[in-house]
Amino acid sequence: MMNFIRTLLIYEIILLKIYHIIKLLHQQQVVAYPTEAMFGLGCDPDSEKAVHTLLTLKKRDWQKGLILVAANYEQLANYIDDNSLNINQRARMFSLWPGPITWTIPARTTTPCWLTGKFSTLAVRISAFKPVRMLCLAFGKPIVSTSANVSGQSPARNICEVRQQFGAAFPVMDQIIEGRYSPSEIRDAISGQLIRRG
């Protein structure tokens, strides 16, 4: 019984943290949150203002494009061209999802360039990490996912490292990362080709 109560309290604390972060996302702010391997910077992918702020904070070239992380495939429907994938390509993707694999999929023509950068594809991932899934489910859509670091510096693996790079008042979802040490692997969904080793 005590373990059950402890589990409920932990989930309640996580939910309170998530709803605080969601409030900031709705205000077009950039936040830091835990992922499988490191802390990520995230924002509302539909807000050009928020994405511009994120890119400025990271000192990242917009042409490189960004990754969206989602709780499920349905959340990606407004951003990717699912019709461009055949049954085998979909099966290959879903055999590795949810998990730390990012796939580049042809983007919809309506997907903004601040997400795709110079590419006609969009990098997307369905996370298996419970805090990320809960965050995306509560937000009702994917969030931008990029490592929490200024370009050229090491990715932040804890709250102190996030705040060293982005300031003591930077909003962070206080949660322990899963323990992986490498970023997500990136593959092309059409060809299966490895783009970045994880």
From Swiss-Prot:
Catalytic activity: L-threonine + hydrogencarbonate + ATP = L-threonylcarbamoyladenylate + diphosphate + H2O
Protein family membership: Belongs to the SUA5 family. TsaC subfamily.
GO cellular component terms, A-Z: cytoplasm
Stored Pfam families: Sua5_yciO_yrdC
Coiled coil residues, start to end: none
Matching InterPro entries: DHBP_synth_RibB-like_a/b_dom (IPR017945), Sua5-like_dom (IPR006070), TC-AMP_synthase (IPR023535), TC-AMP_synthase_SUA5 (IPR050156)
GO molecular function, one term: ATP binding
Domain YrdC-like per the UniProt entry, residue ranges: 15-198
EC code: 2.7.7.87
Keyword list, A-Z: ATP-binding, Cytoplasm, Nucleotide-binding, Nucleotidyltransferase, Transferase, tRNA processing
Function: Required for the formation of a threonylcarbamoyl group on adenosine at position 37 (t(6)A37) in tRNAs that read codons beginning with adenine. Catalyzes the conversion of L-threonine, HCO(3)(-)/CO(2) and ATP to give threonylcarbamoyl-AMP (TC-AMP) as the acyladenylate intermediate, with the release of diphosphate.
Biological process (GO), any one: tRNA threonylcarbamoyladenosine modification
Name by which UniProt lists this protein: Threonylcarbamoyl-AMP synthase
Localization per Swiss-Prot or TrEMBL: Cytoplasm
Family matches, as Gene3D superfamilies: DHBP synthase
TM stretches of this protein: none
Tree of life domain: Bacteria
